[in-house]
Regions:
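Canonical Rossmann dinucleotide-binding motif of NAD(H)/NADP(H)-dependent dehydrogenases/reductases
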Residues: 2-33
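Short, small/polar-rich loop/turn modules that mediate ligand/substrate recognition or access, typified
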Residues: 173-177, 230-231
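Active-site helix of classical SDR
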Residues: 122, 157, 165
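Alpha-helical segment proximal to the catalytic Tyr-Lys
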Residues: 127, 169-174
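Short C-terminal tail/terminal secondary-structure segment
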Residues: 145-146, 220, 224-244
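Substrate-binding pocket helix/loop in short-chain dehydrogenase/reductase
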Residues: 98-99, 106-111, 200
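Residue(s) in the substrate-gating loop at a strand-loop-helix junction
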Residues: 141
Length: 244
């Protein structure tokens, strides 16, 4: 897919990995819808920077834990930009809540944002994407491919994203491709100290941490070159999953 001039919606695009995706897609000439949940200031700053550089970008706030807001978001993008070519479902929450401590509200919040929202966003975006042979990229992580004992709701939600990717790939073919990226240690939690970072590096076969650019390159591959790839989850973890 030639990206220049096309429109991408990146959920959770105001911070961290989502921001890296936004900046990369804008750099490819895409017009970018930057979704945010609670990070309005960050989203506005990202868009201001992009506009100063000559890119076309706009912010769209929505609490994706609310099904009504998730369902309505794609139509807002189309109303603003006139089309939608790419959906990147990167908004997520990763909360450390062991099994015995997980409340119904925590479970629902995590599953609604991480899994339910990507489904309904894809559902509502599908007619627009199909018209232009568009693409969906979901962001999973290693927690969806192995059990994280202290993150039960998160692990379940991301495992669901992996299967959702397969289901949507079949359901939306041949007009839309649907794939996922499962990043490993490409952007570690902000509160990790040097000891934790060193441990992660030493327990990764490639003996280093990744960078956001590693995940960005995976996204660009799927969008620009992966026209015959659908239903797959591309693991970007330096081989870390192999040591489990």
């Amino acid at each position: 897919m030639e990206l220049a001039g096309r429109v991408a919606l990146v959920t959770g695009g105001a911070r961290r990995m989502g921001r890296a995706f936004v900046e990369a897609l804008a750099g490819r000439g895409m017009r970018v819808a930057v979704h945010y949940g609670a990070s309005a200031d960050d989203a506005n700053a990202v868009v201001a920077t992009l506009r100063d550089a000559g890119h076309d970008a706009a912010t769209f706030g929505a609490d994706l834990r609310d099904a009504t807001q998730a369902i309505g978001l794609p139509a807002r993008i189309v109303a603003h930009f006139g089309r939608l070519d790419v959906l990147v479902n990167s908004a997520a929450v990763m909360e450390r809540v062991p099994v015995a401590e997980t409340t119904v509200q925590q479970w629902d919040d995590i599953l609604h944002l991480n899994l339910r929202a990507p489904f309904f966003l894809a559902q509502q975006a599908a007619p627009h994407l199909a018209a232009v042979h568009g693409k969906i990229v979901n962001i999973a992580d290693l927690g969806g491919l192995e059990p994280w004992r202290n993150y039960p709701a998160h692990s379940v939600s991301k495992a669901g994203v992996v299967m959702l990717t397969k289901v949507l790939a079949v359901a939306l073919a041949p007009d839309i491709t649907v794939n996922a990226i499962a990043p490993g240690t490409v952007l570690v939690p902000e509160d990790y100290d040097d000891a934790k970072r060193t441990f992660l590096s030493e327990t990764t076969p490639l003996l280093r941490l990744g960078t956001p650019n590693d995940a960005v390159e995976a996204l660009l591959y799927l969008l620009e070159h992966g026209d015959f790839v659908t239903g797959e989850t591309l693991v970007v973890d330096g081989g870390r999953l192999l040591r489990r």
